[in-house]
């Protein structure tokens, strides 16, 4: 039997009609289709699962047909099952789906932004021709969940967006954002995530209202977002009325927008253009960190995956252009009990604790590295298991001059030296467009805002010859070209520059 409430019955139909009649008299509220409580994110795993389910249904139909046609006694799984529908659907999903895209790999920021992109287009979504202003517009529920700045210009404006810095998806695909509760005008240390519907029950204030630091008098009016008269509004209330406060001033914008210093003083349209243009910067040959930053540069570079980070704390034992070796701290090497019959296998292992002889005196002290001589002494004078650990050395390989999806150069350079002590998750090698583990997309050059004989009219700029001579803005681009040599009827094709009846000047020979 179906559980109660799983199917429509007469009472449901009556309830629907009653609500519609009430709405015609102005009683009740209509659901807002653009409210993030009514919109959920379908992740790539869910999209693939739907395609896989379709292919399994096709395969089931083929199996049933074969079972009815062929003799049951002679059937084998190989005869019945044809995996071609599954392979075809998965290939089609990754190869030609509207939501399966070639990763934007111009620089680390473009890669990170592409992975955090949200799209209202695609199968089961909107069509850009049919999408009106309402669905493209910024909604109050986007606050802290979807960036109001970062979106493309043109026909996709508002349909393709970017996750805000602190936004997170819950188990059901709804976007959540973190808040701290306010008690007597002071913010708690505990951080809780709320979706758009949960947030409506509270009065929320942004981080930069300074409530978090407890510096605002309780009677003072502060900016906040509240649910008033059936819709969310940005208004002012006293500190006593505030229930929740944001955890960061960057919470409402995306990673790319948070890299712009003094963003609050920018015009929104220009901020949008600046955010999008950062993703088009090619990695330079000589990088330089920005003089004025926002503090997000380090996190953006590390989270993009282009820099190399150490997995465990330890000491650097070897560095060259292609690899780095780090000896782990002993605490991060697994301890094992070694019985006497396996003592001979312990060459190179380190003792975790002192080992006593049969007489009770200390035979070997802690941190002794075992060799064949010490193992002989152990076999003669010790009969119990010992605790040892193998000090491990991790090797990190660097990517050298490889080609990205957009033909930019991916080259990692070590930034540690032999003997350096490193912590876990510390940057040990720079990638493209990074400097000492920080994102470095451009150069700090002296700029003059002045007319120059009309050469810089409109968007034109005049640059110094030194920028070219000193490789200030030089970048490396790697292109791959393929050519096929086929077997033809007259004979196999040959790739050569010795052209018959052609002079040396044709092929550039001197």
PLM feature spans:
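Short hydrophobic beta/alpha edge segments that flank linear recognition/processing sites
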Residues: 154, 323-324, 371, 422-437
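Short histidine-centered loop motifs in beta-beta connectors
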Residues: 397-423, 510
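Extended, domain-scale alpha-helical bundle/helix-rich regions
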Residues: 1-138, 147-160, 170, 176-316, ...
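Carboxylate/His-rich catalytic cores and anion/metal-binding grooves
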Residues: 312-332, 448-488
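P-loop NTPase nucleotide-binding/switch module
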Residues: 121, 128-130, 135, 399-401, ...
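A structural signal for short beta-strand/turn segments enriched in small hydrophobics and glycine
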Residues: 314, 370, 416-428, 449
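Short, surface-exposed secondary-structure boundary micro-motifs
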Residues: 162, 297, 321, 329, ...
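Short, small/polar residue-rich loop motifs at catalytic or cofactor-binding pockets
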Residues: 142-143, 303, 415
């Amino acid at each position: 039997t179906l559980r109660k409430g799983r199917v429509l019955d007469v009472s449901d139909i009556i309830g629907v009609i009653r609500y519609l009649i009430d709405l015609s008299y102005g009683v009740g509220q209509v659901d807002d289709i653009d409210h993030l409580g009514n919109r959920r994110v379908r992740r790539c795993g869910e999209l693939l699962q739907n395609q896989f389910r379709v292919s399994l249904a096709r395969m089931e139909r083929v199996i049933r047909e074969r079972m009815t046609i062929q003799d049951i006694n002679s059937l084998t799984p190989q005869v019945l099952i044809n995996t071609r529908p599954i392979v075809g659907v998965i290939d089609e999903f990754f190869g030609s789906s509207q939501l399966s895209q070639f990763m934007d790999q111009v620089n680390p920021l473009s890669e990170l932004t592409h992975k955090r992109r949200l799209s209202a287009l695609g199968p089961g979504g909107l069509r850009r021709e049919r999408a009106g202003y309402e669905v493209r517009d910024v909604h109050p529920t986007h606050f802290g969940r979807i960036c109001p700045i970062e979106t493309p210009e043109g026909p996709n404006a508002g349909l393709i967006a970017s996750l805000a810095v602190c936004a997170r998806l819950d188990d059901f695909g709804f976007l959540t954002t973190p808040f701290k509760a306010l008690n007597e005008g002071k913010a708690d240390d505990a951080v809780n995530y709320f979706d758009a519907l949960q947030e409506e029950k509270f009065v929320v204030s942004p981080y930069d209202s300074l409530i978090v630091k407890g510096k605002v008098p309780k009677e003072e009016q502060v900016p906040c977002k509240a649910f008033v008269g059936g819709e969310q509004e940005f208004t002012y209330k006293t500190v006593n009325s505030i229930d929740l406060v944001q955890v960061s001033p960057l919470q409402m914008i995306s990673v790319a927008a948070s890299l712009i210093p003094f963003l609050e003083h920018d015009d929104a349209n220009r901020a949008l253009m600046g955010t999008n243009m950062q993703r088009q910067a090619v990695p330079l040959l000589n990088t330089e960190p920005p003089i004025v930053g926002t503090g997000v540069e380090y996190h953006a570079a590390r989270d993009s995956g282009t820099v190399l980070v150490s997995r465990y704390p330890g000491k650097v034992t070897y560095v060259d252009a292609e690899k780095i070796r780090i000896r782990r701290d002993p605490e991060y090497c697994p301890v094992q009990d070694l019985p006497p019959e396996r003592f001979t296998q312990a060459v190179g292992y380190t003792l975790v604790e002192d080992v006593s002889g049969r007489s009770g005196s200390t035979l070997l002290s802690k941190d002794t590295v075992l060799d064949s001589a010490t193992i002989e002494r152990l076999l003669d004078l010790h009969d119990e298991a010992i605790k040892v650990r193998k000090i491990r050395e991790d090797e990190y390989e660097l990517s050298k001059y490889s080609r990205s999806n957009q033909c930019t150069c991916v080259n990692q350079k070590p930034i540690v030296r032999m003997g350096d002590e490193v912590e876990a998750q510390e940057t040990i090698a720079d990638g493209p467009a990074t400097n000492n583990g920080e994102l470095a997309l451009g150069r700090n050059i002296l700029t003059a805002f002045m007319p120059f004989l009309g050469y810089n009219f409109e968007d034109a700029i005049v640059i110094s010859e030194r920028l070219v001579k000193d490789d200030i803005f030089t970048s490396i681009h790697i292109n791959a070209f393929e050519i096929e040599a086929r077997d033809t009827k007259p004979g196999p094709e040959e790739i050569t520059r010795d052209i018959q009846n052609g002079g040396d000047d044709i092929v550039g020979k001197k």
